[in-house]
Amino acid sequence: MDRQNYRPRIIDRKVEEYLSAFGAVCIEGPKWCGKTWTSAYHSKSGIYIGDPAGNFQNRQLAQLSPALVLEGETTRLIDEWQEVPPLWDAVRYQVDQTPKKGQFILTGSVTPNHKGILHSGAGRIARLRIMHRPGEIAPGRRIRTNDAKKC
């Protein structure tokens, strides 16, 4: 991510507020609304579970050892966490073990698959919904005001 090209968003203040209050923040929203871009801006490291490189090696690693993909400089971005639901519990456990604020940002679908998640994350993982900004430019297209939908 080229931080110099990042255009500040209204939601940035909320992300910073939540990171200062919780061990992790889960940013949810529709495709192309800027979840990954916004989260990467607020992160110091990250792993992209949906990256097809190496036959989806990041996803495979997350399935084999969820705790291993959490290693890295914090705040750490876990993009598309819902592709490996046990990552949620791994984040919750890590936040319990190291009670620091702003350790992780998880990004994912508005309607994640909760199958395989054992704990709600209450008090540890704050949920934040993001939506398209009217008139915002998304990669490859322009979003018209009437295209904006609330999550």
Please give the residue ranges for each predicted region.
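Phosphate-binding site recognition
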Residues: 1-151
